[in-house]
């Protein structure tokens, strides 16, 4: 046992020595590799240094070259800037006044343009400050002394007013629109049309501003004075506001409302609706009121047929002021008539009823050839005839004329097919006068307590009695109501009373006088209320104001206007009592010259 242990220890020591040598050799090899790497890097370092030095030298050379080049560019930039300043000063100097003006006509690709200046057409150059592509045909341009376009201006605002007739085909070269216009002497001219005007929607008959020298039409001229002659409104007068004209209202409703509201029946029965209505009769009897009531009633009934509310009822009443329609310049009155019917067609195209009402129709549409110092009716009447015939295709337009002297209106207007329906508005009789009084003497008015006592305080009975008493006073054929004695050409004489000249307007005036007297009585006595005596006094005052009127004009013409037709009147004598009147004077009635008063 003791000999075996010493023999085993040398073997273990040898194994430990072999392991230590291997580890040492491994470390030696690592150190040798590191030494070799360091030697290799040491050998390569000079080459890298030389390469970097070479690159540095090249970079320094490039910096030097760029610095030199930058200096040259800076110098060149300074020279260019100085040249640019000089050119700018030159351009500004060229644009300095004095300058001329012209009209731009056409541009070319070589930056030259055609202009019209000083009465001639020229091709000139354009300043660099002006963009040729922004110039518009007909535009004003400013030219320097060298005839170079230096500035673009606006379009001309002055010139000759011409009437546009029609657009012509676009010019093949300039691609510019052209138009045919009529000058003030009706000579025809072909002019260029500026772009703004061409885009405005020109219509035949429009007035345009034209530079006759340059040959350009610039702008529309708003000649809207017809606005002052036409009252465009939806009337608020109903049939209930009109008294004493029941038969006439029924006639005009049959003539106007039936075709509008029952057009299908008219088509079924092949019945052509009337195109016009003539209301004739003495002044102040409700002709204009009836026309307004027709427009109001039409609007409401058309709205009801469509299912619209009454608040949406819509119609148009074009009230033409006849005498103001006349114009001293040839063709202006005809133009106004065309514009009126053009407006009527525009409104009617919306499906809205349109009534064109000519008041005092005899003043503008007299019989042709009846004028003494003027023959304007020879062109005005045909213009209206053509417009009325043109309304034939429009379902919503009707012409209503009113006149005191229907005998002076041209027969071509009154024939069937134009003003088909003729309705006479008579002076009110006693029953009609009561109806008219009831429109102004209502139960809501304050009545004097003494008058109310006679009827036991019954307001309605008292008002009715006041109306009855007033009408009896007005229509009584008594001496105090005698107005005129007329002598006819055959020698017959006739006494006319105030009732023969009564009208709705006179009745309204009498009621207004009575109301004013009642107000003055309240201020003086403190007792309110309208009395019968106020109405009686108003009748006397109204009659007294009218007594002098017959002596102011030719008796026969005056009688025709007042509604008295028949034998020619040669003598008038006033019979009003209580006034300082001459016994009468004879007035020779000249041959009817056709002049209105």
Curated annotation (Swiss-Prot):
Residues 21-97 form a coiled coil. Residues 1-22 are annotated as: Disordered. GO terms for biological process: modification-dependent protein catabolic process; proteasomal protein catabolic process. ATP binds at residues 284-289. This is Proteasome-associated ATPase. GO terms for cellular component: proteasome complex. HAMAP family: ARC_ATPase (MF_02112). InterPro entries: AAA+_ATPase, AAA_ATPase_domain, ATPase_AAA_core, ATPase_AAA_CS, NA-bd_OB-fold, P-loop_NTPase, Prot_ATP_ID_OB_2nd, Prot_ATP_ID_OB_N. Consists of three main regions, an N-terminal coiled-coil domain that binds to protein Pup and functions as a docking station, an interdomain involved in ARC hexamerization, and a C-terminal ATPase domain of the AAA type. Residues 1-12 have a biased composition (Basic and acidic residues). It comes from Saccharopolyspora erythraea (strain ATCC 11635 / DSM 40517 / JCM 4748 / NBRC 13426 / NCIMB 8594 / NRRL 2338). The keyword Cell membrane does not apply. SMART domains: AAA. The keyword ATP-binding applies. Residues 596-597 are annotated as: Docks into pockets in the proteasome alpha-ring. ATPase which is responsible for recognizing, binding, unfolding and translocation of pupylated proteins into the bacterial 20S proteasome core particle. May be essential for opening the gate of the 20S proteasome via an interaction with its C-terminus, thereby allowing substrate entry and access to the site of proteolysis. Thus, the C-termini of the proteasomal ATPase may function like a 'key in a lock' to induce gate opening and therefore regulate proteolysis. Keywords: ATP-binding, Chaperone, Coiled coil, Nucleotide-binding, Proteasome. PROSITE patterns: AAA. Homohexamer. Assembles into a hexameric ring structure that caps the 20S proteasome core. Strongly interacts with the prokaryotic ubiquitin-like protein Pup through a hydrophobic interface; the interacting region of ARC lies in its N-terminal coiled-coil domain. There is one Pup binding site per ARC hexamer ring. Upon ATP-binding, the C-terminus of ARC interacts with the alpha-rings of the proteasome core, possibly by binding to the intersubunit pockets. Gene3D superfamilies: 1.10.8.60, 1.20.5.170, Nucleic acid-binding proteins (2.40.50.140), P-loop containing nucleotide triphosphate hydrolases (3.40.50.300). GO terms for molecular function: ATP binding; ATP hydrolysis activity. Belongs to the AAA ATPase family. The gene is arc. It comes from the Bacteria. Pathway: Protein degradation; proteasomal Pup-dependent pathway.
């Amino acid at each position: 046992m003791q000999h075996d242990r010493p023999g085993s220890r040398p073997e273990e020591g040898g194994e430990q020595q072999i392991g230590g040598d291997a580890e040492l050799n491994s470390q030696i090899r690592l150190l040798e590799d590191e030494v070799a790497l360091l030697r290799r890097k040491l050998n390569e370092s000079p080459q890298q240094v030389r390469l970097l030095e070479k690159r540095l030298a090249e970079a320094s050379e490039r910096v030097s070259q760029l610095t030199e080049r930058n200096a040259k560019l800076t110098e060149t930039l300074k020279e260019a800037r100085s040249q640019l300043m000089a050119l700018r000063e030159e351009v500004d100097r060229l644009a300095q006044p004095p300058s001329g003006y012209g009209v731009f006509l056409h541009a070319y690709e070589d930056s030259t343009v055609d202009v019209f200046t000083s009465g001639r057409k020229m091709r000139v150059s354009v300043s660099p400050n002006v963009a040729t592509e922004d110039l518009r045909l007909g535009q004003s341009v400013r030219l320097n002394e060298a005839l170079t376009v230096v500035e673009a201006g606006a379009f001309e605002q002055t010139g000759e007013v011409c009437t546009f007739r029609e657009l012509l085909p676009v010019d093949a070269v300039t691609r510019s629109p052209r138009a045919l216009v009529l000058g003030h002497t009706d000579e025809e001219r072909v002019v260029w049309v500026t772009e703004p005007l061409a885009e405005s929607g020109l219509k035949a008959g429009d007035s345009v501003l034209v530079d006759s020298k340059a040959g350009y039409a610039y702008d529309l001229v708003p000649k809207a004075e017809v606005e002052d002659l036409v009252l465009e409104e939806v009337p608020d007068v109903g049939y209930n506001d009109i008294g004493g004209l029941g038969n006439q209202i029924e006639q005009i409703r049959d003539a106007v409302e039936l075709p509008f509201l029952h057009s299908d029946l008219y088509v079924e029965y092949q019945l052509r609706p009337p195109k016009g209505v003539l209301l004739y009769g003495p002044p102040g009897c409700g002709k204009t009121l009836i026309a307004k009531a027709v427009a109001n009633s039409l609007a409401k009934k058309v709205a009801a047929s469509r299912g619209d509310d009454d608040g949406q009822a819509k119609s148009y009443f074009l009230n033409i002021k006849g005498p103001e329609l006349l114009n001293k310049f040839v063709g202006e009155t005809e133009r106004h008539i065309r514009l009126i019917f053009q407006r009527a067609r525009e409104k009617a195209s919306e499906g809205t009823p349109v009534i064109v009402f000519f008041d005092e129709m005899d003043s503008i549409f007299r019989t042709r050839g009846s004028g003494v110092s003027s023959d304007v009716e020879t062109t005005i009447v045909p213009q209206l005839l053509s417009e009325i015939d043109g309304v034939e295709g429009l379902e919503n337009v009707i012409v209503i004329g009113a006149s005191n002297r229907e005998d002076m209106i041209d027969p071509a207007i009154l024939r069937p097919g134009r003003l088909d329906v003729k309705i006479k508005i008579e002076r009110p009789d006693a029953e009609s006068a009561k109806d008219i009084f009831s429109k102004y003497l209502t139960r809501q008015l304050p009545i004097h307590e003494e008058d109310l006592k006679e009827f036991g305080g019954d307001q309605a009975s008292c008002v009715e009695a006041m109306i009855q008493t007033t009408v009896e006073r007005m229509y009584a054929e008594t001496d105090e109501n005698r107005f005129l004695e007329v002598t006819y050409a055959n020698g017959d004489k006739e006494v006319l009373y105030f009732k023969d000249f009564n009208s709705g307007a006179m009745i309204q005036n009498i009621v207004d006088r009575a109301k004013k007297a009642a107000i003055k009585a309240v201020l003086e006595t403190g007792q309110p209320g309208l009395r019968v005596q106020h109405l009686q006094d108003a009748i006397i005052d109204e009659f007294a104001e009218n007594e002098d009127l017959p002596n102011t004009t030719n008796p026969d013409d005056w009688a025709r206007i007042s509604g008295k037709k028949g034998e020619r009147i040669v003598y008038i004598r006033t019979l009003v009592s209580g006034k300082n009147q001459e016994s009468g004077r004879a007035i020779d009635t000249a041959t009817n010259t056709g002049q209105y008063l």
